[in-house]
Amino acid sequence: MSDEQPAEDETEEAAAESEDTQEVAANAKLFGKWDVAEIHYEDPSTRRYLAVTPVAHTMGRHAQKQFKKSEISIVERLANRLMKTGANAGKKQQALKIVRDAFDIVHERTDENPIQVLVSAVENAAPREETVRLKYGGISVPQAVDTAPQRRVDQALKFLADGAHSASFKTPTDAAEALANQLAGAADYNVQTYAIGQKKEKERVAAAAR
């Protein structure tokens, strides 16, 4: 009996520690500020590809696994997109700082959770169709095709990052402010925003190629 009692105590302690760990994980916030629990999705087709977690840096654990990028937080994927080839290549901490500062600006302007603003921006900036080139007898013919949900998210992140880069490169506008403008504008479906403009252009070309 004396041997069984310590074993039971250890089991109870382990269970209590597990519950505490789960509670801490459930209450964890992105950048120590933003709640990831109550995020609403308007587009059911892209929902499974818009992962939201309190972890903003996974150390590239899914880098060599096909399609595993969809399990990475959409915030980290945006930061990865900001590390364009060139001066920003490999500067992950700098990219995360830009995203963190942009979130603060978005919250000041809209008084909303910036993660929700990002999710809405990605949903709005994701093109629904695009074109591919088919060859018939040596002649290239554009053909409209539906865009896969995962590619829609990829394209939206690209448009948002490119818009922030073009608005802040060799201009007085700070990178964080430029990104905040893109996120807020795309979330409101402002056609003057670079990301929304690129989406509409892709869909316009696809409509002409039907």
UniProtKB/Swiss-Prot annotation:
Q: Which domain of life is it from?
A: Archaea
- Check the record and name the NCBIfam families matching this protein: PRK04027.1, uS7_euk_arch
Record keywords? Ribonucleoprotein, Ribosomal protein, RNA-binding, rRNA-binding
Q: Which GO terms describe its cellular component?
A: cytosolic small ribosomal subunit; ribosome
PROSITE patterns, per database record:
RIBOSOMAL_S7
**Gene3D superfamilies registered for this protein in UniProt:** Ribosomal protein S7 domain (1.10.455.10)
Q: Does the keyword Isomerase apply?
A: no
List every stretch annotated Disordered. Answer: 1-23
Could you say which protein family the record assigns here? Belongs to the universal ribosomal protein uS7 family.
Instruction: Give me the stretches of Acidic residues compositional bias.
Output: 1-22
Organism in which the protein naturally occurs: Halobacterium salinarum (strain ATCC 700922 / JCM 11081 / NRC-1)
The UniProt subunit note reads as follows: Part of the 30S ribosomal subunit. Contacts proteins S9 and S11.
Q: Name one GO biological process term.
A: translation
- Output this protein's name: Small ribosomal subunit protein uS7
Q: Main role?
A: One of the primary rRNA binding proteins, it binds directly to 16S rRNA where it nucleates assembly of the head domain of the 30S subunit. Is located at the subunit interface close to the decoding center.
Asked whether the UniProt record includes Ribosomal protein among its keywords, one would answer yes
A GO term, aspect molecular function: mRNA binding
